[in-house]
């Protein structure tokens, strides 16, 4: 199955670079791999080496959550291949809710389902700070002290890190002297964990967790992190000083600690943001653009005002030596960036396209926009969508998942009440009973999911009708099976998902495909959907129509492509910004209060506008024309 990674284009030349230089900006050395699977495989081998060398009992500490799951799979594979045995291993988990809930809502459910159930570990060698009922203060204190004594001095501790720097349930302000204890969970923790429960009211408010001092007693510590969502915290604990508001930073004091991260989690580290400050680089045209844009941000100047002194003072002497003089670099990068701007995302007919991002022919083009959820198309590239339709292209939009779990029960009842008032039948009480039958931690009833899916389909069709698209012939609701679990945890992507996409692509045979270029959660819906499309394309290799097909990547509501990577920038007029906003409004079930809003309190239309307006501002500051907003894309191939 295809894995989504962006092709490399220039960067730090690490071959032969001394380790001390490579990690020169890092307080915790970072081992960076292409994706979470590659990092987990290497880490699993390191763990296996430690276990196999140990003559006695090997004591391994593991964190909860989703970050260790790829590691579990790699360890299970090594076990099945006979390269590791857990018969002499003790496993210590760093936390659990107090009192411990049912197994399917336990903090350690993935540990059991993905690791312990598949290896030869002795049940008595699994240590979890788990109490099934509330005890008196003296008893629970004794339990914590006993667990802490056993968990002190672990051979190895492997932990994922939360986006706010929490490790386990050690949140901002936790003492570096803390030991295993009962913890009253703050609202932020409960909100974060509520996705595994019916609502925040059902989410536990207490836990038992290992303290920072206990963690620091381990002989060796490995931190792990995957996806762009973790990039900011990875930068903080890797390069920034200790900060009590980021508990993971206390681990910088450990003498034997390092991190295993993927390229997306490492994206904000200096050796990725400004690798010329670390060592020699490969200077490709896009990488030169990246460096010049970075330099403009440092000195607060447009491209054509940069001086030789600016380059030299900011570590870009090698660039001058290989590609100077500076005036030539400035002009080349200015022209390169200016040529990304095009108001014709499908190509301008009968025009010189030698410097345009999209060829003029064929015209019109057949286009497929893949939208992971039923609103990602208008949120992420609504302005470009408008232009493609209005400029006469045959545009199709494919909604990959139903998005049904992201609809509040109250929204369903409101729609049923409206249907009753309009005389289309009375199912209000029936649906109310279905909602009342829901059980915390269990999948939603299929009948309810079907209603929620119908609501989102109607909203999506309404939005694209406002662009002039025929919602009967050019809207495709794929309902990929991996998504239809009825809960937050989705199924694995399978060939059944791929086949649905292949059928659509063969039907349309597009010249352009637009995909969500999401680099965040490796197992999130956006990433899974994009990888499903790429796998479908891979299986279609050899089809004649693919020779003239190009794939363009857009970003979501929160993040944007850095200008060093951009291949096409589509400017939006003030009227197009308003038209896009009104299309987002059509998604009423997502407009104000949604079940899983994340940390950003802004509505989707606000996020989308601020993101595209900020991109326009960056182009303006670099010396380009000033636009109301700009949507940018990266060309995958």
Description of each model-found segment:
Residues 1-59, 352-354, 361:
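N-terminal glycine-/serine-/threonine-rich phosphate-binding loop
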Residues 2-7, 22, 219-315:
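ATP/nucleoside-binding phosphotransfer catalytic cores, i.e., glycine-rich phosphate-binding loops
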Residues 7-27, 84-158:
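Ligand-binding beta-strand-loop-alpha-helix segment within the catalytic cores
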Residues 53-81:
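Glycine-rich N-terminal segment of FAD-binding domains in flavoprotein oxidoreductases
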Residues 134, 297-374, 378-547, 553, ...:
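Active-site beta-strand->loop->alpha-helix modules in alpha/beta enzyme cores, enriched
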Residues 144, 163-185, 238-241, 527-536, ...:
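Short, surface-exposed, charged loop/turn segments at secondary-structure junctions
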Residues 157, 164, 168-212:
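Class I SAM-dependent methyltransferase SAM-binding "motif I" and its flanking Rossmann-like core
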Residues 158-160, 196, 201-238, 245, ...:
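Glycine-rich anion-binding loop/nest that anchors nucleotide
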């Amino acid at each position: 199955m295809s894995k989504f990674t962006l092709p490399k284009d220039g960067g730090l030349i690490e071959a032969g670079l001394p380790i001390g230089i490579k990690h020169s900006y890092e307080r915790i050395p970072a081992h960076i791999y292409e994706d979470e699977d590659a990092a987990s495989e290497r880490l699993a081998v390191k763990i296996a080496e430690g276990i196999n060398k140990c003559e006695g009992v090997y004591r391994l500490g593991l964190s909860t959550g989703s970050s260790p799951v790829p590691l579990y799979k790699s360890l299970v594979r090594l076990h099945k291949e006979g390269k590791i045995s857990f018969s002499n291993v003790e496993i210590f988990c760093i936390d659990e809710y107090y009192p411990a809930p049912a197994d399917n809502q336990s903090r350690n459910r993935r540990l059991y389902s993905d690791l312990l159930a598949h290896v030869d570990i002795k049940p008595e060698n699994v240590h979890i700070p788990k109490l099934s009922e509330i005890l008196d203060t003296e008893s629970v204190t004794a339990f914590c002290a006993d667990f802490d004594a056993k968990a002190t001095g672990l051979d190895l501790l492997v932990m994922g890190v939360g986006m706010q720097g929490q490790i386990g349930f050690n949140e901002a302000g936790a003492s570096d002297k803390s030991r295993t204890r009962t913890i009253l969970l703050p609202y932020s923790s409960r909100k974060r964990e509520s996705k595994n429960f019916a609502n925040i009211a059902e989410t536990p408010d207490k836990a038992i967790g290992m303290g920072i001092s206990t963690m620091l007693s381990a002989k060796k510590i490995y931190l792990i992190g995957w996806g762009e969502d973790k990039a900011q915290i990875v930068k903080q604990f890797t390069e920034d000083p200790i900060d009590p508001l980021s508990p993971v930073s206390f681990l910088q004091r450990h003498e034997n600690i390092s991190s295993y991260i993927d390229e997306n989690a490492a994206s904000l580290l200096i050796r990725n943001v400004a690798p010329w400050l670390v060592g020699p680089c490969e200077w490709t045209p896009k990488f030169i653009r990246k460096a010049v844009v970075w330099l403009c941000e440092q000195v607060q100047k447009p491209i054509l005002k940069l001086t030789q002194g600016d380059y030299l003072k900011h570590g870009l002497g090698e660039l001058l030596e290989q590609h100077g003089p500076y005036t030539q670099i400035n002009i080349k990068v200015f022209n390169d960036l200016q040529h990304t701007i095009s108001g014709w995302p499908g190509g301008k007919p009968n025009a010189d396209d030698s410097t345009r991002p999209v060829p003029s022919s064929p015209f019109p083009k057949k286009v497929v926009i893949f939208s992971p959820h039923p609103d990602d198309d208008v949120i992420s590239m609504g302005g470009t969508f408008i232009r493609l339709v209005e400029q006469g292209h045959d545009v199709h939009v494919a909604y990959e998942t139903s998005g049904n779990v992201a609809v509040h029960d109250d929204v369903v009842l409101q729609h049923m009440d409206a249907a009753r008032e309009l005389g289309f039948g009375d199912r209000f009480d029936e649906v109310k009973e279905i909602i009342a039958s829901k059980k915390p931690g269990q999948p939603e009833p299929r009948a309810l999911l079907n209603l929620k899916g119908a609501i989102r389909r109607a909203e999506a069709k309404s939005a694209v009708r406002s662009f002039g698209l025929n919602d009967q012939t050019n809207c495709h609701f794929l309902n990929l099976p991996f998504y239809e679990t009825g809960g937050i945890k989705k199924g694995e992507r399978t060939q059944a998902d791929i086949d649905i996409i292949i059928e659509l692509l063969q039907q349309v045979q597009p010249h352009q495909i637009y995909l969500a270029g999401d680099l965040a959660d490796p197992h999130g819906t956006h990433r899974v959907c994009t990888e499903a499309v790429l796998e479908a394309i891979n299986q279609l290799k050899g089809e004649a129509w693919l020779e003239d097909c190009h794939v363009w990547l857009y970003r979501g509501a929160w993040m944007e492509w850095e200008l060093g990577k951009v291949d096409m920038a589509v400017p939006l007029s003030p009227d197009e910004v308003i038209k896009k906003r009104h299309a987002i409004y059509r998604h009423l079930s997502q407009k104000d209060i949604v079940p899983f809003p994340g940390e950003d309190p802004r509505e989707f239309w606000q996020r989308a506008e601020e993101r595209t307006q900020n991109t326009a501002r960056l182009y303006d500051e670099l010396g380009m024309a000033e636009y109301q907003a700009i949507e940018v894309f990266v060309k995958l191939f």
